Every structure is written in structure tokens, then in C-alpha cells.
């Protein structure tokens, strides 16, 4: 079958043509218009026949693949220094195909799949004439082709600036690149295999130096700073990049689609589909997933519930640039998914192995192979993309980006979130076992993305907070239902709970196994529609039986159950436990982060990490105010309501938490003996926290006020916006009616409230809304009281006068 993308048949290829070894550019980039004889022409077979002479490269395109879709994936082999992309990362991806033109030329088109219709439908003709695919290149056939093939010259196609095989215009602008320099650009090699052809090209671009201005760059002290400046371009006036383009033949018959369902979190692709029987255009959305198929003799076994091995398992290779001590943990992070695939009916469906460095027929850039690429980057992150067939969602391969500095990220998370309960976290450099464990969980998370899974930020909300402290329960069940959440580590656990790493680390868990079952269990239905109706019933049954399988989305829709970095079903309770641990950690930071000759850089970094963690807790709690629960459901579930307001008592508890932990000065963050080794203005960190919460995008957001107003119209028991604003101002301005002195922190809080409220009232987004009206009335009430306020403290008196004037000036505009 054409699916066998992982086969390792011998490559047919070679290096640069004679006279162009290694990185040596051609002596002459011009192409003669005369037809040259090519007695020295050499030829190799593969997906395309590939021929070369001293000057040019040729493809021989077999007639049987004309019209067949080919996925062209371009990656950096090596990139210029000083940019945020690295060798191995994807540059571009396009579906292309060859076809014969009426004038005899061979055309290369890009297939822009946005609309479709079956060819046996009358409407197919209308779809075809309204979806002309762009011609990327036109080739005059060359002489000497084998029978049943067309020979074309492809030198300029790859050495030039053909976008589908290179950087797009936006990326070039971000690098400030100009035109390709033909005299310093050349094809390094072309290798051809049975179902793919690999082209490696060195390209040199002219450089358009940015104008001096704000931003980073090589200006140096006192010198001009250049925004988006590329060091090589600034120093040499040109930028050289090496690309590899994999041209992979896609299956002639696309894999059967599995239609997208918002109740299970998968990445999806789609297009608009037309048919003769329609009365409205159908939007087809289908998930991205690998093709796993049983051998014919195993199909009945699988239908009976027996585990079977797929014809072609999912294999990830570990980049040989990966430090040896981390390779076993990256491999384990992949292999941990095997249990999930067993729930879907497969055994030995997925595994990882080290890259066979002694195999000359394998390339890290080859799109037949999935690789965890190790990137020498200061970026503290990792990511898991996939390359898929846009017709069906079939994942072809993935190159996971693993940044070297991700270890800094997991170190800081673990010390801040688990340092109070795990002594292993209390040092700068972790031992290999602990760091390996942390790498393993990140590996599993990123592999999940490459299997098609989206983040499930709601999974952690399915665990009651108190169970996070129950040693037996949490060590057996885990602190979050999904590795695809940003749940990190169990920061709720207290030292006296004696919870081990089994209850502290995330793991592949119930939701992940369910999601893999949904994506990968064969149903053997003939059509995507029949398959979808089957899964609709299964989803309803499973979620009713086990609410822990809920997919909560990716934290972007104002549902406080689905947030990043949170734990448990009660943000207030979880955050209170988290703060208790932060108070234990913050005093120990210097002792845990001792490094000879360090100028407090390590201490400063970890102190800032504690502040950031506290900021997350404030965000988790404030999201409940004006939030709503979102429950996706189908028509067969009439007892479920999609949008529900957060209960009033939960919102009021959230506001009380903010009053106790933010509106009142959190002195524990600054009352540490080393604070003046870090800053001469400790309260500035606290002011930043205030700015994040008391803002036009958080507590005073017009969308939040309007949601409260809308829900109050239909549910009198819900939290009314006027009640909310009264509660909020009563907390923020509690001194106003009592004549008490106001300290500097509280004065800042009050000024911030007024500034944010004025910003909202004056915004166009708030115009004509009830939220603006209520906030305007609140400001007027504050102004009236501030103008009459009395205080024996001169600073407080001046403060109230300034508040009254600020509001008055704003209202007069």
C-alpha cells in the first residue's frame, strides 16, 4: 500500500553535481537557452526519476502519478544564527500535483483545498470552475525521457525563490530578507525513494537592514537597536539558509475521515462540501490522526475485542544530538502511550527508538520519519506539531521540537510547586533521575499533540481538591485526568500528607485513554457519517457514566473550570493550599539556590517564579467572577444546558479571596530577608499583581459585566452586576467612609481601580451597554464620596482629592 511511509528502502541519490562539492557555490548560475547534449547524464529511479549533469538537475515524472497529490514539506536543515527557528523545524507545507497542459508543458499546481464535491455530482462542475488551483511552475519537456514519463529541468525551481518549497513572504519579511542570490544558491543533493523525493538546497538571500529603532538587535551599548535584526545580515549583508524539501506521495485513496466532535479534544481540518441533494452547504470537519490498520486476518479478532498489532505502527526516533542521559526518558514518554492504544484495540501501536546513525538511507529531514528534534535553543519550551493529509486528516509524520532550555522551565515549576513536599526539588541542579522524570512527562504531553490531541485544560477540574491531599487516592488516580492539561505538579499537597512522586507528577490518564479510543478504535463502518453517529452514542454513554472524561477546551472561553496551570474543582481552596506552600518555599529560596560567585541571579529567578505562581492563583480565582460553564452536547442530551452562569456563592467566595490575598497587601511576598538583594522597590512586584487583576481585561472587563447583566435577566438568583460592583468597591475603598488613613499599597490599588474603570467607560466596546452604565454610576459615587472624605492624615486627604479630580476630569470629556 502507498501508506508505507516508514519503509527504509535504499535511497537513490547523491551529492552535488561535479564541480559543486559540499557548500561550494556554482561558478555560473545562469541557464543557457540552448539545448545541451548530456552524455554524462546520470539517472536514479524513485518516486521521480532524478537525473543530473554538471549544470542541471532533472525530474522524470511518471504518467501514473500525474494528478496524484504530493505533500511538500520544507524544513530548515541549518538556519542563520540569532533567529527563533532552528535546524529541523518546519518552514512550509503544501499539497501539490503535476498535470499536462494543452500546449504540452508539464504544470506544477498547488492544491488549495477549501471546497470539494464528488465527481459524480452535477454540482462538481460548478465547484471546479470556482476553485482554480494556482500554477506554481510550468516546464517544457526535455528530451531523453523514458517511455511513460516526462523529463523536466528543476534546477531553477529549487534554487530560485519558489514559495511552496521555501519561506513564505511573511517569514521572509520577519527575517528582512530580499531576493535569492543566484550566484550563491545551489542544490546540495537530491535523493529519491519509492514514495518520496528529498531535495536539499542552500539559498543565500540579500538582506534589507531594518531602520534603527526600538527593539532588540546587535547595536550594543550606546548604539542603535534594530528591531528583528539578523546578525548575519547586519554584518555580511546576506543571509544563508539550508532547506530540505520532502515531496511525499499521498495515498491514492485518502484514509476514511473521522468527523470532529467538540466533546473530545482533537485538532481538526476541513473544507466546504457541495452536493446535488443539499439545501445548504456542508462544512466537513475531521480530526487529525495516524492511519492504523489491522492485517486482513486480524480484523475479525479486533471486532471481537482482541488486541491486534497494526500493519504499520507509529514510530518516533530520537535525534542523535540529544544528550545520552535524556534519551531513555524521551523514549519512555513515547512508550507510555501504549496503554492508551490498547484501550483502542491495538498492541505495540507506538514506540520510540534511537536514530540509527549508521544507516545512510535515513535522513532526519525525511518526511517519512517522525523525530524528536533536539534544538540548541535558549527557549524554555517544547512543541508537538504534525504533518497531515488535508483531504482526510491522516497524520503523515511529526517532528517534535525539543528546546534544550525546557529543563529550566520544568526545574522552576517543580521547585516552586513541589519544593515544600519533595526535598529533591530543593537545589539548582537536579539529579538525572528527577530531571529525567520531568522530561518524561513533557515528552508524553508533546507526543499527545502529535497524535492529534489538543490541550484539555478542564481535566484537572474533575478532581475534588481534598482528594489531592489524600495520599492513597491521588497516588493511584493521579492529580489530573489528562497529560494534555497544563496541570504540572500537585501544588495542593501539604508536607504532612507525605505524598510521593506518583501523586505529584502528571501522567497519561483516563481522559487520554478515552480520547485515543475515540480517535483510533476502528468501527468498520463504510462512511464517515455512519462512524460519526456511532461515536455520538458512545460519547453520550461514556460521559454520563464517567464525568471525568469531560473535555473542557483550551482555556479560552471564560469557563473557570478550564484554565491553565490550575488544579481541582475549587480554585479558592486549591489556591489557599498553594499559597501555604509558597510561603514555605519563598523563605528557603537562597538556601536552595546557592551557587558560588552567583550575583543573586538564581535567587532572583526563583523569587520571580514564586511571584508568577501566586499571580496564577489570582487568575484562577478571578476567572470565576462573571464566568460561565460551557457544556457541549448533542440534541440527544436535552437535560444539559450549554451555557450556565457560575453560581453566585462561588463568585462571591472568589471576590472574598481576592480581598484577603490581594486587596490587602500580601506582605509575605516582600517580607523576606533577601528582598533588597533583588530590588530597591519591592512593592513594584505587588503593583504588577494589582495591575493584572484590577484591570479593564479582568475584574472590570466590560464583557464580564455584560455577562453578569445578561444572566441576571433570566435568573434572579444569579450574581447581579450592580451587586458585584458594590461588593468590589466596598472592598477596594473600605477606608472611604471611615476616615481611616490609607497606606501606600492601598492608595495604589484605589488609583488602579479608578484608572481601569475610566478606561472601560471611555472605550468604544463599552458604548451602549448596561455594564458601562453601571460602572459610570460607580465612578460617580466614588467621586462624590472622595470629594467629601475627611482624614487627619495629609497624604490620605490629598489622595482622596486626587481621586475625585481624576474622575471629574474624565467625566467632563
What spans do the regions from the language model cover?
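Extended catalytic-interface subdomain
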Residues: 383, 388, 394-402, 443-451, ...
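Stable alpha-helical elements in mature extracytoplasmic
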Residues: 326, 330-333, 435, 439, ...
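Sec-exported extracytoplasmic/periplasmic mature domains
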Residues: 335-346, 448-449, 453, 489, ...
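Boundary at the C-terminal end of the N-terminal hydrophobic targeting segment
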Residues: 9-13
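Bacterial N-terminal signal peptides
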Residues: 1-8
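Auxiliary tRNA-acceptor-end handling modules of aminoacyl-tRNA synthetases
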Residues: 14-57, 61-322, 340, 344, ...
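Conserved catalytic/binding loops enriched for acidic/polar residues
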Residues: 460-813
Amino acid at each position: 500500500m502507498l501508506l508505507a511511509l516508514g519503509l527504509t528502502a535504499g535511497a537513490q541519490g547523491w551529492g552535488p553535481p561535479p564541480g559543486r562539492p559540499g557548500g561550494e557555490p556554482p561558478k555560473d548560475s545562469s541557464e543557457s537557452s540552448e539545448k545541451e547534449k548530456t552524455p554524462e547524464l546520470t539517472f536514479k529511479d524513485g518516486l521521480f526519476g532524478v537525473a543530473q549533469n554538471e549544470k542541471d538537475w532533472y525530474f522524470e515524472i511518471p504518467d501514473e502519478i500525474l494528478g496524484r497529490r504530493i505533500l511538500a514539506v520544507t524544513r530548515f536543515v541549518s538556519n542563520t544564527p540569532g533567529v527563533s527557528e532552528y535546524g529541523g523545524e518546519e518552514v512550509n507545507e503544501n499539497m501539490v500535483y503535476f498535470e499536462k497542459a494543452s500546449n504540452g508543458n508539464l504544470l506544477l499546481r498547488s492544491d488549495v483545498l477549501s471546497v470539494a464535491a464528488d465527481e459524480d455530482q452535477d454540482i462538481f462542475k460548478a465547484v471546479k470552475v470556482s476553485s482554480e488551483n494556482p500554477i506554481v511552475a510550468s516546464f517544457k519537456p526535455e528530451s531523453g525521457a523514458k517511455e511513460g514519463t516526462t523529463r523536466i529541468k528543476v534546477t531553477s525551481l529549487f534554487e530560485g525563490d519558489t514559495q511552496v518549497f521555501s519561506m513564505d513572504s511573511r517569514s521572509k519579511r520577519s527575517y528582512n530578507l530580499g531576493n535569492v542570490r543566484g550566484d550563491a544558491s545551489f542544490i546540495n543533493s537530491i535523493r529519491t525513494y519509492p514514495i518520496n523525493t528529498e531535495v536539499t538546497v542552500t539559498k543565500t538571500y540579500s538582506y534589507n537592514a531594518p531602520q534603527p529603532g526600538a527593539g532588540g538587535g546587535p547595536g550594543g551599548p550606546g548604539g542603535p537597536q534594530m528591531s528583528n535584526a539578523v546578525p548575519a545580515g547586519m554584518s555580511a549583508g546576506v543571509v544563508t539558509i539550508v532547506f530540505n524539501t520532502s515531496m511525499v506521495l499521498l495515498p491514492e485513496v485518502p484514509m476514511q475521515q473521522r468527523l470532529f466532535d467538540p466533546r473530545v479534544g482533537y485538532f481538526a481540518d476541513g473544507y466546504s462540501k457541495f452536493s446535488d441533494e443539499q439545501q445548504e452547504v456542508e462544512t466537513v470537519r475531521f480530526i487529525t490522526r495516524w492511519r492504523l490498520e489491522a492485517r486482513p486476518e486480524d480484523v475479525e479478532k479486533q471486532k471481537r475485542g482482541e488486541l491486534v498489532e497494526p500493519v504499520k505502527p507509529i514510530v518516533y526516533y530520537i535525534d542523535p544530538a540529544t544528550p545520552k542521559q535524556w534519551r531513555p526518558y524521551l523514549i519512555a514518554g513515547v512508550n507510555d502511550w501504549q496503554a492508551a492504544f490498547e484501550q483502542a484495540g491495538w498492541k505495540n501501536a507506538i514506540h520510540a527508538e534511537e536514530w540509527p546513525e549508521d544507516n545512510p538511507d535515513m535522513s532526519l529531514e525525511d518526511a517519512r520519519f517522525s523525530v524528536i528534534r533536539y534544538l540548541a535553543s535558549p527557549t524554555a519550551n517544547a512543541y508537538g506539531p504534525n504533518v497531515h493529509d488535508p483531504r482526510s486528516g491522516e497524520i503523515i509524520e511529526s517532528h517534535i521540537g525539543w528546546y534544550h532550555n525546557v529543563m529550566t522551565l520544568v526545574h522552576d515549576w517543580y521547585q516552586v510547586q513541589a519544593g515544600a513536599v519533595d526535598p529533591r526539588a530543593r537545589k539548582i541542579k537536579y539529579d538525572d533521575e528527577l530531571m529525567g522524570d520531568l522530561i518524561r512527562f513533557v515528552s508524553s504531553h508533546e507526543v499527545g499533540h502529535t497524535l492529534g490531541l489538543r490541550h484539555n485544560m478542564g481535566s484537572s477540574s474533575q478532581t475534588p481538591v481534598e482528594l489531592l491531599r489524600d495520599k492513597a487516592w491521588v497516588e493511584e488516580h493521579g492529580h489530573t485526568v489528562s497529560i494534555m492539561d497544563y496541570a504540572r505538579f500537585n501544588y495542593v499537597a501539604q508536607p504532612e500528607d507525605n505524598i510521593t512522586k506518583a501523586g505529584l507528577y502528571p501522567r497519561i490518564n483516563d481522559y487520554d485513554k478515552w480520547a485515543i479510543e475515540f480517535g483510533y478504535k476502528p468501527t468498520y463502518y463504510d462512511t464517515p457519517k455512519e462512524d460519526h453517529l456511532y461515536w455520538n452514542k458512545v460519547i453520550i454513554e461514556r460521559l454520563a457514566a464517567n464525568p471525568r472524561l469531560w473535555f473542557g477546551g483550551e482555556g479560552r472561553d471564560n469557563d473557570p473550570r478550564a484554565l491553565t496551570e490550575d488544579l481541582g474543582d475549587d480554585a479558592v481552596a486549591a489556591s489557599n493550599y498553594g499559597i501555604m506552600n509558597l510561603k514555605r518555599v519563598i523563605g528557603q529560596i537562597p538556601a536552595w539556590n546557592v551557587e558560588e560567585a552567583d550575583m543573586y541571579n538564581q535567587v532572583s529567578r526563583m523569587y520571580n517564579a514564586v511571584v508568577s505562581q501566586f499571580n496564577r492563583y489570582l487568575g484562577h480565582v478571578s476567572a470565576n467572577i462573571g464566568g460561565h460553564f460551557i457544556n457541549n452536547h448533542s440534541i440527544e442530551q436535552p437535560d444539559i444546558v450549554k451555557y450556565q452562569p457560575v453560581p453566585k456563592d462561588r463568585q462571591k467566595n472568589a471576590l472574598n479571596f481576592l480581598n484577603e490575598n490581594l486587596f490587602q497587601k500580601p506582605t509575605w511576598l516582600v517580607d523576606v530577608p533577601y528582598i533588597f538583594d533583588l530590588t530597591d522597590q519591592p512593592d513594584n512586584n505587588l503593583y504588577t499583581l494589582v495591575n493584572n487583576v484590577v484591570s479593564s481585561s479582568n475584574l472590570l472587563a466590560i464583557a464580564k459585566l455584560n455577562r453578569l447583566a445578561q444572566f441576571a435577566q433570566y435568573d434572579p438568583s444569579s450574581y447581579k452586576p450592580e451587586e458585584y460592583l458594590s461588593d468590589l468597591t466596598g472592598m477596594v475603598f473600605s477606608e472611604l467612609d471611615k476616615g481611616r488613613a490609607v497606606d501606600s499599597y492601598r492608595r495604589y490599588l484605589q488609583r488602579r481601580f479608578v484608572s481601569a474603570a475610566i478606561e472601560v467607560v471611555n472605550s468604544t466596546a463599552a458604548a451602549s451597554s448596561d455594564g458601562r452604565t453601571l460602572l459610570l454610576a460607580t465612578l460617580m459615587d466614588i467621586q462624590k464620596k472622595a470629594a467629601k472624605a475627611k482624614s487627619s492624615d495629609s497624604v490620605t486627604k490629598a489622595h482622596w482629592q486626587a481621586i475625585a479630580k481624576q474622575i471629574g476630569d474624565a467625566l467632563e470629556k
